[in-house]
């Protein structure tokens, strides 16, 4: 693994649009070195028999079967509204013109 330089840290900061003061370059250089060393360690792990996952816990979507049912007539629904205008519900204005 190649050593991380101050130039590398400045480049990463620039790509991330971070304003990194010069007095913090050494700190971030050391931290990036440790992070990349850890990633290199992870790359050594044999994962050939590990099933790929996207979550640590299995997520199951709870669904029900669709059932056809009678729906109210449009006119009945429109009559339930406090105000209507033709075939539309009338609602209070919330955006200024």
UniProtKB/Swiss-Prot annotation:
Gene Ontology biological-process entries: glutaminyl-tRNAGln biosynthesis via transamidation; regulation of translational fidelity; translation
Stored InterPro entries: Asp/Glu-ADT_sf_sub_c (IPR036113), GatC (IPR003837)
Domain of life of the native organism: Bacteria
GO molecular function, one term: glutaminyl-tRNA synthase (glutamine-hydrolyzing) activity
EC nos: 6.3.5.-
ATP-binding found in the keyword field: yes
Keywords: ATP-binding, Ligase, Nucleotide-binding, Protein biosynthesis
Function: Allows the formation of correctly charged Asn-tRNA(Asn) or Gln-tRNA(Gln) through the transamidation of misacylated Asp-tRNA(Asn) or Glu-tRNA(Gln) in organisms which lack either or both of asparaginyl-tRNA or glutaminyl-tRNA synthetases. The reaction takes place in the presence of glutamine and ATP through an activated phospho-Asp-tRNA(Asn) or phospho-Glu-tRNA(Gln).
Family to which this protein belongs: Belongs to the GatC family.
Quaternary data: Heterotrimer of A, B and C subunits.
Protein name: Aspartyl/glutamyl-tRNA(Asn/Gln) amidotransferase subunit C
Lineage summary: Bacteria, Bacillati, Cyanobacteriota, Cyanophyceae, Synechococcales
């Amino acid at each position: 693994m190649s050593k991380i330089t101050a130039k590398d840290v400045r480049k990463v900061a620039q790509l991330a649009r971070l304003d990194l003061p010069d007095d913090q370059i050494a700190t971030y250089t050391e931290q990036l070195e440790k992070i990349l060393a850890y990633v290199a360690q992870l790359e050594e792990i044999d994962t050939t028999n590990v099933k790929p996952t996207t979550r640590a816990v299995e997520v199951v979507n709870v669904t029900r079967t669709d059932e056809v049912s009678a729906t109210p007539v449009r006119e009945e629904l429109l009559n339930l509204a406090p105000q209507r205008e033709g075939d539309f519900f009338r609602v209070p204005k919330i955006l200024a013109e």
